[in-house]
Amino acid sequence: MPPLSVTAITAAILGLIFFRLSMNVIGYRRQHKVSLGSGGHDDLERAMRAQGNFAEYVPISLILMACLELNAAPWWLVAATGIALIVGRLLHAKGINEPPPNFALRVLGMKFTFFNLIALSALNLGWVGLRLLG
């Protein structure tokens, strides 16, 4: 399998999700005629936070996935982390954007994201550590 294939597919899917979240923000900005901030509109604020939160957590997760994949971790292990990241980000976005917001979905999405971030960090430390020890 070519290097970073799993990470590339995951990044492509996440890129499309980010595009959708961005279009959601733009739509609310146009609807409410707000160019900066949320203008006190709850729906715009939620859309902005869904997009912002995505932008905060996805890059480090993709970097950790790429590190794991470049260090010859099994493709299925890298893919499992990618799936967990995608599921977590979708749940969070749905939970925060639903009117009224679905707090349980939002929290579940963050749990997926945090667990995945910790798992990716631990996997990188363990996998690379074992490879270095021979």
Say what each PLM segment does.
Residues 2-32:
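N-terminal signal-anchor transmembrane alpha helix
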Residues 10, 48-51, 81-84, 109-116:
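Physicochemical signature of membrane-embedded alpha-helices that form the seven-helix bundle of GPCRs
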Residues 14-17, 21, 84-92, 116-123:
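Membrane-embedded alpha-helical transmembrane segments of multi-pass integral membrane proteins
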Residues 23-48:
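Cytosolic, membrane-interface loops and tails of multi-pass inner-membrane proteins
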Residues 53-65, 117-118:
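Core segments of transmembrane alpha-helices
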Residues 66-87:
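Short alpha-helical packing/oligomerization segments
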Residues 91-118:
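Interfacial loop-to-transmembrane junctions
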Residues 122-134:
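Juxtamembrane boundary at the C-terminal end of a transmembrane helix
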